[in-house]
Regions:
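Conserved catalytic core of the tyrosine transesterase superfamily
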Residues: 1-175
Length: 175
């Protein structure tokens, strides 16, 4: 997928979502004032849980966000970070179509699979699990109140999940 195939806004949205697992609604609600470039952190209150979340800005999506801000974002008084591509400029209502279009253009098979930012949230959770990150930290990163919610995201990672289970004794073993 070349940079000519995707707008800077869409690239930044997908990179941010892919690496952080942020919900679509939180990306849409992200404001310029939520991004602390001096300390390289994004401060938000998650829409679904009302829990604060502080995400370190990684260079990969941070650079994509800066590229969008400097080269493509419309010059206007709107505080939302990601805006519609055409006037009147306003906050986005969803990122589903953006992510779906980019995933399709990249040739990712989506039949029978999750699409949109939920696919990226599952990927973030599974990647963290494979790296040995403890469940409470994964829950925190995804902004879940309850670790049971995180388990839904991890249940698709069968190989890693099965390595974490304790072996059960065979039936009839009295030891």
């Amino acid at each position: 997928l070349s940079s000519a195939d995707i707008s800077r806004r869409n690239a930044a949205i997908c990179q941010l979502s892919f690496e952080t697992g942020l919900r679509s609604v939180d990306i849409c609600n992200l404001r310029l004032s939520d991004v602390d470039w001096k300390h390289n952190v994004i401060h938000i209150v998650q829409s679904k849980t009302q829990r604060p979340l502080n995400l370190p800005i990684r260079s990969s999506y941070g650079n994509a966000m800066v590229d969008y801000l400097l080269k493509e974002r419309p010059r206007c008084n709107e505080d939302y970070f990601f805006l519609s591509a055409h006037a009147p400029y306003a906050k986005l209502n969803t990122t589903w179509h953006i992510v779906r279009t980019v995933v399709f253009a990249a040739g990712v098979e989506t039949v029978g699979r999750l699409t949109g930012t939920r696919m990226f949230r599952h990927n973030v959770a599974s990647t963290m699990l494979r790296k040995g990150v403890p469940l409470p930290a994964i829950s925190e990163e995804l902004g879940h109140k309850c670790q049971d919610s995180t388990m839904v995201y991890l249940s698709t990672d069968q190989e890693t999940m099965s390595s974490l289970t304790l072996p059960l004794p065979k039936a009839g073993d009295n030891e």
